């Protein structure tokens, strides 16, 4: 059994670590609330944009934008969102597993796969795995802006425009609640048709365009893709803070249990030492 001094040292070390994890838990809780506010503020815009685009995809348009047309999927692109930092449980690895599974399914069909990665964890993971990474961005911080993402999104859109990609997907963690973060894959291009009930009844939509339909749709559809990627980033950020808060709370609780166990061992060691000293005193007295 370890000596009392060594055990006291371990207890002190665990208590120091516990203070750190508790502080990180509190910081993550504060950041999570701010991230949730940002996510909830941007959700209505992203969801409304998705509905409008779904209607456009179902409409009989006088100008047919290339983003609306299905084509044989020989080259598939993914925009994969991750965190820049760790200590957030299995958040990143879960979304990576989902992405890799989907990518593998396309590869088995003979398609080539190309990526744009957001977040240093995704960059490290997919580059280490030998994936073809066309664009990357990291260091977005706790308040990401659309301007930070436009470069990487533009790279993938240009590839789609030039026929170097036939499908484009967005991979991210969707915030459900504090305890649940759902790895999600959304199709960005070609534009998915609306799944609303009126669309299922084959409702026909008529549009009046001002200015010309080509200029309007060219701008609208690019803005749609950008808005979905931005929403994915803020959703993933809220997931990151929630997962980190939960992970740090678990670490703090584990530290408490470990301290209790070590204190029990310490008390046993101290009791054994006292018993040994008493035995030596009694033995010495008997010898005299």
Swiss-Prot record:
Coiled coil regions, renumbered to chain: none
Subunit annotation: F-type ATPases have 2 components, CF(1) - the catalytic core - and CF(0) - the membrane proton channel. CF(1) has five subunits: alpha(3), beta(3), gamma(1), delta(1), epsilon(1). CF(0) has three main subunits: a, b and c.
UniProt entry tagged with the keyword Ion transport: yes
CDD domains given in the database record: F1-ATPase_gamma
GO biological process annotation, one example: proton motive force-driven plasma membrane ATP synthesis
Gene Ontology MF: a single term: ATP binding
Database matches in HAMAP family: ATP_synth_gamma_bact (MF_00815)
Annotated function: Produces ATP from ADP in the presence of a proton gradient across the membrane. The gamma chain is believed to be important in regulating ATPase activity and the flow of protons through the CF(0) complex.
Localization annotation: Cell inner membrane
Family the entry assigns: Belongs to the ATPase gamma chain family.
Gene (UniProt): atpG
PANTHER family per the UniProt record, alphabetical: ATP SYNTHASE GAMMA CHAIN, ATP SYNTHASE SUBUNIT GAMMA, MITOCHONDRIAL
Record-linked Pfam families: ATP-synt
Topological relation to the membrane, as annotated: Peripheral membrane protein
Keyword annotations from UniProtKB, A to Z: ATP synthesis, Cell inner membrane, Cell membrane, CF(1), Hydrogen ion transport, Ion transport, Membrane, Transport
Protein name: ATP synthase gamma chain
GO annotation, cellular component aspect: plasma membrane; proton-transporting ATP synthase complex
Tree of life domain: Bacteria
Keyword Isomerase: no
């Amino acid at each position: 059994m370890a000596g009392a001094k060594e055990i006291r040292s371990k207890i002190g070390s665990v208590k120091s670590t516990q203070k750190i994890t508790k502080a990180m838990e509190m910081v993550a809780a504060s950041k999570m609330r701010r991230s949730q506010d940002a996510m909830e503020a941007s959700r209505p815009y992203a969801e409304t944009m998705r509905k409008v685009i779904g209607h456009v995809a179902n409409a009989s348009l006088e100008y047919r934008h290339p983003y609306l047309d299905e084509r044989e999927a020989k080259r598939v692109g993914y925009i994969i969102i991750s965190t820049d930092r760790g200590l957030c449980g299995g958040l990143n690895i879960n979304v990576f597993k989902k992405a890799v599974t989907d990518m593998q399914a396309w590869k088995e069909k003979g398609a080539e796969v190309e990526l744009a990665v957001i977040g240093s964890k995704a960059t490290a993971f997919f580059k280490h795995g030998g994936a073809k990474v066309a664009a990357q961005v990291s260091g977005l911080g706790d308040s990401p802006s659309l301007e930070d993402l436009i470069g990487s999104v533009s790279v993938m859109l240009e590839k789609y425009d030039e026929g170097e990609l036939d499908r484009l997907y967005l991979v991210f963690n969707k915030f459900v609640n504090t305890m649940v973060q759902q790895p999600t894959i959304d199709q960005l291009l070609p534009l998915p048709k609306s799944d609303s009930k009126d669309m299922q009844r084959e409702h026909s939509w008529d549009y009046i365009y001002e200015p010309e339909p080509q200029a309007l749709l060219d701008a609208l559809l690019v803005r749609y893709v950008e808005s979905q990627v931005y929403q994915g980033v803020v959703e993933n950020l809220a997931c990151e803070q929630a997962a980190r808060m939960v992970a740090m709370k678990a670490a703090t609780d584990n530290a408490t249990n470990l301290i209790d166990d070590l204190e029990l061992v310490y008390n046993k060691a101290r009791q054994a030492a006292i018993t040994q000293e008493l035995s030596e005193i009694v033995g010495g007295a008997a010898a005299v």
